């Protein structure tokens, strides 16, 4: 399958903004406050949503003709962050504290994705090794998160040297260009065994997914 992408919607799925209008009965946040915006608003009714897995909502993309019901994915099934004004469910908003710039706040949800994968789902323990495949925004922030959690070594693979360089700046201990080396063999050499403790696949490339497995 594929994403139910609709070209009529303005893109931008992880972003921040300033609240300029509130819906009826909204009192959790105030006008003028800065917020980071999570991509998904689940329908709240299907089995997945009731289990807390709203990013896999069974009603993905079905708005039922209303902003108040149905699943929405910013930039995919409703207008996203590149529009001037966007309507978002209160459950998708994260208040941005003072001291964090707008530019930094834009990365809150992306960093949260990496943190959730490594810490909550993965249960990473300091001293365990991590390979991150793909040096895009989530992959690069996964490097920073892994280092913060005490992972060692932290290895980044990509096919672009500029992304590998950014990865080193963010804390990657080792970087591998997948065009130049056999990543699986190199990781086995580095680990001195079958491989690393964790692989976080962030590229979406079929080859990288197979190698991660």
Listing of model-derived features with the role each one plays in the protein:
Residues 2-50, 55, 97-99:
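Glycine-rich beta-strand-centered segment in the early N-terminal region that forms part
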Residues 28, 38-92:
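Cysteine-cluster motifs in flexible loop/terminal segments that predominantly coordinate metals
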Residues 33, 84, 173, 197:
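Conserved acidic residues
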Residues 38, 200-202:
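Short, well-ordered coil/turn residues at beta-beta hairpins
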Residues 91-93, 97-181, 185, 198:
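Mid-domain Rossmann-like dinucleotide-binding core that forms the NAD(H)/NADP(H) cofactor-binding site
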Residues 183-193:
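Conserved amphipathic alpha-helix within the SDR
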Residues 194-200:
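Short SAM/SAH-binding signature in class I
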Residues 206-213:
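Rossmann-fold NAD(P) dinucleotide-binding segment
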């Amino acid at each position: 399958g594929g994403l139910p992408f609709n070209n009529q919607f303005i893109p931008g799925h992880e972003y921040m903004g300033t609240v300029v209008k509130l819906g009826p009965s909204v009192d959790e946040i105030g006008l003028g406050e800065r917020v980071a915006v999570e991509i998904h608003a689940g329908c709240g009714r299907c089995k997945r949503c009731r289990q807390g897995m709203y990013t896999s909502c069974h009603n993905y993309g079905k708005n039922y003709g209303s902003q108040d019901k149905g699943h929405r994915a910013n930039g995919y099934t409703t207008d996203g962050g590149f529009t001037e004004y966007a309507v978002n469910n209160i459950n998708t908003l994260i208040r941005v504290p003072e001291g964090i710039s707008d530019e930094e706040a834009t990365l809150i949800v992306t960093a949260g994705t990496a943190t959730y994968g490594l810490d909550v789902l993965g249960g990473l323990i300091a001293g365990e090794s991590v390979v991150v495949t793909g040096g895009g925004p989530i992959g690069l922030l996964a490097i920073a998160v892994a280092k913060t959690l005490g992972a060692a070594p932290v290895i980044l693979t990509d096919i672009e040297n500029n992304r590998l360089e950014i990865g080193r700046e963010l804390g990657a201990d080792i970087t591998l260009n997948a065009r130049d080396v056999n990543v699986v063999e190199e990781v086995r050499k580095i680990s001195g065994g079958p491989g690393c403790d964790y692989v976080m696949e962030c590229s979406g490339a079929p080859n990288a997914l197979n190698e991660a497995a």
